[in-house]
Amino acid sequence: MLDNVLRIATRQSPLALWQAHYVKDALMATHPGLTVELVPMVTRGDVILDTPLAKVGGKGLFVKELEIALLEKRADIAVHSMKDVPVAFPDGLGLVTICEREDPRDAFVSNKYHSLDDLPAGSIVGTSSLRRQCQLAERRPDLIIRSLRGNVGTRLGKLDNGDYDAIILAVAGLKRLGLESRIRTALPPDVSLPAVGQGAVGIECRLDDARTQALLAPLNHSQTALRVTAERAMNTRLEGGCQVPIGSYAEIINGEIWLRALVGAPDGSVMVRGERRGSPEQAEQMGISLAEELLENGARAILTEVYNGETPA
């Protein structure tokens, strides 16, 4: 980093800019005298909006350009929504800080209906997520689920135009953008298990940049980091990209981690679920062992068929 200046690589969507400003404000409050600059960038994920994520390479599309900026030293850190962060990092880069988690649940958003169960048969529901799609299809096979891309404002605009009867978004994103009033119902994890890391903001930087890592250290939230560690360990063992139907959610209750996970066929016809409880020190191992249980119980076949563009029978 330059003398007393730290540069943040960020996407230009309203939510990405909110996250970057959140980290900027936290850094400046923690380190008076530090100058923090934003380096806004356009990623392929922001440009390719007419194709479902699963068909164009998944959410890694949202981080690659930011990582190139780090490697070329045009920026010092990149701020990500943790649910968009792939399981692997380029050589020399790593996730060094995870900030305190916002509400991780999915939100049911509709102008006409109060809840998922209120939707009449044949209603059109929008989501770009195979994870949300498989859980919706399992619970309500009578609904029509259609792809929905774009930033939060774009998606709400499509709902308001009447293209959809309801859409599913992240509670955290709506709250951060001051749009909490659009949430009709926050879906509990047993109805819609969140994505890995959903609601958490992560910070990536060069692993040889000790000075930047020291500046970031006070922003790390240990309980959130433990929860996300368990979730990501499971996802890594499943070799799950961000475009596959995998849900994973860890809570810390009475000092113990409770990790729940699922892998589902996109049409909701097959769902494999599991859970683990253990001490925080076991977070990573819990994620790995739960993933292995899911693979043995049918997740391997589901994921193989999803990667091959097929639907399990």
Curated annotation (Swiss-Prot):
Cell cycle keyword on record: no
One BP term from GO: heme biosynthetic process
Enzyme class: transferase
Keywords, comma-separated and alphabetical: Porphyrin biosynthesis, Transferase
Cofactor note: Binds 1 dipyrromethane group covalently.
InterPro entries referenced in this protein's UniProt entry, alphabetically: HemC, Porphobilin_deaminase_cofac_BS, Porphobilin_deaminase_N, Porphobilinogen_deaminase_C, Porphobilinogen_deaminase_C_sf
CDD domains, sorted: PBP2_EcHMBS_like
Modified residues (S-(dipyrrolylmethanemethyl)cysteine): 242
Cited Pfam families: Porphobil_deam (PF01379), Porphobil_deamC (PF03900)
EC number(s) stated in the UniProt entry for this protein: 2.5.1.61
Cofactors named for this entry: dipyrromethane
Pathway: Porphyrin-containing compound metabolism; protoporphyrin-IX biosynthesis; coproporphyrinogen-III from 5-aminolevulinate: step 2/4
Transferase recorded as keyword: yes
Catalytic activity: 4 porphobilinogen + H2O = hydroxymethylbilane + 4 NH4(+)
GO terms assigned for molecular function: hydroxymethylbilane synthase activity
GO CC terms in record: cytoplasm
Protein family membership: Belongs to the HMBS family.
Subunit structure: Monomer.
Function: Tetrapolymerization of the monopyrrole PBG into the hydroxymethylbilane pre-uroporphyrinogen in several discrete steps.
Note: The porphobilinogen subunits are added to the dipyrromethane group.
The protein, known as: Porphobilinogen deaminase
Gene: hemC
